[in-house]
Structure formats: structure tokens, C-alpha cells
């Protein structure tokens, strides 16, 4: 069940016509994150497929697509904070800024008849006070989360039909 959206959390859902294991496999691969990004910020990824809480990988970023902060190219470390195989994966991002921001991205997967109900969420309720006062959240809009789910659906479906 989708939690109601708050001013500090966005959730969107989409049914993807693939098994939860196929969707989860895609989300566990750092390169999969780059493939499905609708924001245009994720440029590449380095790291192994994640297998549990505490695993990390590097994402190469460029905020030019958002046209908000001229940071140029930079890297962030993604740390997995929730990992329940074929059910949920979530992570936080750490970059050069301090204090660390503390926003969380994640996916909940629920098997439905012949498919997977995927909930994508973006939660900034636990960010540090300095970031709350900065007024820059949410970085990613509800529309961007919806678009990412569309790309995920297309990507997982394409992967399943070509394997």
C-alpha cells in the first residue's frame, strides 16, 4: 500500500509486466540506475551488483540537466540502506557536501498477477536541518519518479525478451 505523500516524501507506482526478481535484479545493478535515470544527472556507475545493506558503488553525476547548481562533473557514493531480495531496495547518497544530506531513494516490489507493482519513493524527511533550511528539496520531482518507472518498465521488459 502506498503511503500518503507528504511534503518530505514522494511515492509513485507502476505495474511492470515482469517478475519481482527481474525488476530487483535490474535495480541491484549500479549500471541499471544510470539506464533508468530520467533526470539526466547520472552519467555512469562503477561498482558491483549490490547484495546487501552497506554495499556501496560510485555514480558519476552532472547537474547541468537540472540547470540549478553549476557543479560540473562529480561523483557520489551510493550506500544501500535497505535490501530485501525481490521486495525492497533503498539507498542514500554521499558526495562532497557536508553535512551529508541524508535523503533516501528506494523501491518496493509487490508481486501481482503476472507482474510486479513497483513503488518508487524519494524521502528527504531525515535530511539535516541545514539542508531543510536551504529550500532545495525535493531535488527530483514526482514527474521524474514517474518517468523513471516508465524507463524501468521498458528496460526490464526489453531485458526479459532479449535474454
Annotate each predicted stretch with a short phrase.
Residues 1-53:
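Hydrophobic ligand-binding cavity/cleft-lining segments
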Residues 4-6, 51, 70-74, 97-101, ...:
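A generic structural micro-feature
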Residues 7-13, 56, 75, 88, ...:
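Intrinsic-disorder/low-complexity, polar/charged segments enriched in Ser/Thr/Lys/Arg/Asp/Glu/Gln
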Residues 12-14, 75-82, 93-95, 103-111:
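Hydrophobic/aromatic beta-strand elements that line small-molecule binding cavities or substrate pockets
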Residues 17-21, 49-51, 81-88, 108-117:
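A short, structured loop/turn motif at beta-sheet edges
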Residues 18, 63-65, 124-126:
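Beta-strand elements of well-folded, non-transmembrane domains
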Residues 45-94, 150, 154-163:
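Glycine-rich portal/gate segments that line the openings of hydrophobic small-molecule binding cavities
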Residues 117, 121-163:
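A conserved amphipathic terminal alpha-helix motif
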Amino acid at each position: 500500500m502506498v503511503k500518503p505523500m507528504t511534503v518530505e516524501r514522494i511515492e509513485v507506482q507502476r505495474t511492470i509486466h515482469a517478475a519481482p526478481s527481474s525488476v530487483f535484479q535490474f535495480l541491484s545493478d549500479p549500471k541499471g540506475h544510470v539506464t533508468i535515470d530520467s533526470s539526466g544527472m547520472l552519467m555512469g556507475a562503477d561498482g558491483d551488483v549490490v547484495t546487501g545493506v552497506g554495499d556501496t558503488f560510485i555514480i558519476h553525476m552532472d547537474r547541468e540537466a537540472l540547470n540549478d547548481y553549476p557543479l560540473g562533473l562529480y561523483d557520489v557514493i551510493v550506500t544501500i540502506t535497505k535490501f530485501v531480495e525481490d521486495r525492497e531496495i533503498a539507498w542514500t547518497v554521499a558526495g562532497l557536501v557536508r553535512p551529508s544530506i541524508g535523503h533516501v531513494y528506494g523501491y518496493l516490489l509487490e508481486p501481482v498477477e503476472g507482474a510486479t507493482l513497483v513503488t518508487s519513493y524519494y524521502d528527504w524527511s531525515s535530511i539535516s536541518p541545514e539542508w531543510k533550511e536551504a529550500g532545495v528539496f525535493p531535488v527530483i520531482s514526482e514527474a521524474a519518479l514517474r518517468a523513471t518507472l516508465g524507463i524501468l518498465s521498458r528496460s526490464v521488459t526489453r531485458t526479459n525478451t532479449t535474454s
